[in-house]
Amino acid sequence: MEKEVIVVGAGLAGSEAAYQLAKRGIKVKLYEMKAKKKTPAHSKDYFSELVCSNSLGSDSLENASGLMKEELRILGSLLIEVADKNRVPAGQALAVDRDGFSEEVTKILKNTKNIEIIEEEFTEFPNDKIVIIASGPLTSDKLFQKISEITGEESLYFYDAAAPIVTFESIDMNKAYFQSRYGKGDGEYINCPMNKEEYYNFYNELIKAERAELKNFEKEKLFDACMPIEKIAMSGEKTMTFGPLKPKGLINPKTEKMDYAVVQLRQDDKEGKLYNIVGFQTNLKFGEQKRVFSMIPGLENAEFIRYGVMHRNTFINSTKLLDKTLKLKNKDNIYFAGQITGGEGYVTAIATGMYVAMNVANRLENKEEFILEDISEIGAIVNYITEEKKKFQPMGANFGIIRSLDENIRDKKEKYRKLSERAIEYLKNSIKGV
């Protein structure tokens, strides 16, 4: 096999994979078509664009996403390093200035030795080179057709949604207030409180608001993590108060009481000029978003610098198709990484990009496969998406898929800390000599 690797897609997984291979002295051709042909969800030409949210999840080791990020730091992840540098206040979460993050990743990759960037759509698979498909949740129709031909699988897809962003100066802070749930962090979230009447007025307008038309809408499959707010509302009149609008853990400083419902906004840029409406991914038409979301107390005169959008997300049946290195079982030179594998979320995408790159590098250097067991969070997610099962649904980082402890610990926080400690020790031992 020629010691040159083709990486398709400069999203989170592809960017990480390309960098890790290049750093190990392997030549990489990185295909990214955005400069000439954007997907429905992308707006910038930068690599590793964060589409849905600017948060990479909790940084706490009592959280599986926090553990996965720590594992990536141990492995030397470029993207987590850049995320740490571009952090914005968000309590225990690792949220980033999304433009600053993507700009820095792009600059590094364009200036890294051994990486050649090709701004074209990739559609033809060579037989003499390793190809890593990291084309993401918005894989082009032509490429996905080629993948379908190679794998023999029909296209599987669902729809993701992205939340609106408003300017801080347009938020009425006489009505809204800063506070983090349960007092964690430094009160970085903006909270827009609703009384019962305001909530039901908002609810009634939301469920009847006009939505954008989608192709094959009847076939949609949605993740709870990116479920459109109108879909949540339509599942029950109080459902939002147990989800994105839950008031628990928040005390309104103006009334010193808990409100009936609360809409939270999270800082989206380093300067604190922009805030995204947490959990408000949506498929409403832009005019309807302005009308309905302006009913939220504090957002009556909000300036929307980006409206929410909805877009298709594709993934393959990884449990049937991929081995433990994320290589196709029936095609020796093709690997997959990122959300197209069914690994859900930003951090999982980075992790699979790192994992595939390490395995491809080892293969080209005639070393043993780098297989992580489900003791680590990265190993657990790889195990989940490659272990054959009757019904495969995408999965993100969580402690439910990691191997249980030998001891039974009732306290969840203590148990999660123990799982994280064991995972970190295991990973450090696993990379000795790698």
Swiss-Prot record:
Its cofactor is FAD. It comes from the Bacteria. InterPro entries: FAD/NAD-bd_sf (IPR036188), MnmG-rel (IPR002218), MnmG_N (IPR040131), TrmFO (IPR004417). Its EC number is 2.1.1.74. Keywords: Cytoplasm, FAD, Flavoprotein, Methyltransferase, NAD, NADP, Transferase, tRNA processing. GO terms for biological process: tRNA methylation; tRNA wobble uridine modification. FAD binds at G9, A10, G11, L12, A13, G14. GO terms for cellular component: cytosol. It is found in: Cytoplasm. It catalyses: uridine(54) in tRNA + (6R)-5,10-methylene-5,6,7,8-tetrahydrofolate + NADH + H(+) = 5-methyluridine(54) in tRNA + (6S)-5,6,7,8-tetrahydrofolate + NAD(+); uridine(54) in tRNA + (6R)-5,10-methylene-5,6,7,8-tetrahydrofolate + NADPH + H(+) = 5-methyluridine(54) in tRNA + (6S)-5,6,7,8-tetrahydrofolate + NADP(+). GO terms for molecular function: flavin adenine dinucleotide binding; tRNA (uracil(54)-C5)-methyltransferase activity, 5,10-methylenetetrahydrofolate-dependent. NCBIfam families: gid_trmFO (TIGR00137), PRK05335.1 (NF003739). Belongs to the MnmG family. TrmFO subfamily. Catalyzes the folate-dependent formation of 5-methyl-uridine at position 54 (M-5-U54) in all tRNAs. This is Methylenetetrahydrofolate--tRNA-(uracil-5-)-methyltransferase TrmFO. It comes from Fusobacterium nucleatum subsp. nucleatum (strain ATCC 25586 / DSM 15643 / BCRC 10681 / CIP 101130 / JCM 8532 / KCTC 2640 / LMG 13131 / VPI 4355).
